[in-house]
Amino acid sequence: MALLSPLLSLSSVPPITSIAVSSSSFPIKLQNVSVALLPSFGQRLVAHGPVIAQKRGTVVAMVSAAAEETAGEDGDQSKVEEANISVQNLPLESKLQLKLEQKIKMKMAKKIRLRRNRLMRKRKLRKRGAWPPSKMKKLKNV
């Protein structure tokens, strides 16, 4: 059951509305979740249900304030512009993060490549009858 503490008012200072979710009908992971909503003048509040991020996971509640006007389109364009920034213009932490991600990708590619080679080698040995190695001991006396 959702409890609303202070009611929304149309004063110049937007009040903080918190929603505490605690009910026996929800799963244990979703009990006692609190979400703070900050309404601004001329906007309506939209609260989406909690989302479980992982199996063990944390509970994330997505809350968005949507105005009657279409102000969301400008935000989408700024996200696209942020993605197109070159590496030289990024701060040092972002550069290190990108280098680290690329290094991890290269390591994974190497592991996959080595595994593929190992499996091909096994396949060829099986075709010749030389795999598994324990079979070779049996074939010595033949």
Swiss-Prot record:
**Keyword rRNA-binding in annotation:** yes
Subcellular location, record wording: Plastid, Chloroplast
Q: Where is the transit peptide?
A: 1-62
Q: Name one GO cellular component term.
A: ribonucleoprotein complex
* GO molecular function, a single term: rRNA binding
Predominant place of localization: plastid
**GO biological process per UniProt:** plastid translation
- Please list where the region (Disordered) is annotated: 123-142
User: What InterPro entries does the entry give?
Assistant: Ribosomal_cL37 (IPR040307)
Instruction: Tell me yes or no: is Signal among this UniProt entry's keywords.
Output: no
Which family is it part of? Belongs to the chloroplast-specific ribosomal protein cL37 family.
Q: What else is known?
A: Three different forms exist, PSRP-5 alpha, PSRP-5 beta and PSRP-5 gamma, due to different transit peptide cleavage.
Which PANTHER family does the UniProt entry name for this protein? 50S RIBOSOMAL PROTEIN 5, CHLOROPLASTIC (PTHR34678), LARGE RIBOSOMAL SUBUNIT PROTEIN CL37 (PTHR34678:SF1)
Give the protein's biological function: Component of the chloroplast ribosome (chloro-ribosome), a dedicated translation machinery responsible for the synthesis of chloroplast genome-encoded proteins, including proteins of the transcription and translation machinery and components of the photosynthetic apparatus.
Describe, as the record does, how this protein assembles with itself and its partners.
Answer: Component of the chloroplast large ribosomal subunit (LSU). Mature 70S chloroplast ribosomes of higher plants consist of a small (30S) and a large (50S) subunit. The 30S small subunit contains 1 molecule of ribosomal RNA (16S rRNA) and 24 different proteins. The 50S large subunit contains 3 rRNA molecules (23S, 5S and 4.5S rRNA) and 33 different proteins.
- This chain's protein is named Large ribosomal subunit protein cL37 alpha
Name the species this protein comes from: Spinacia oleracea (Spinach)
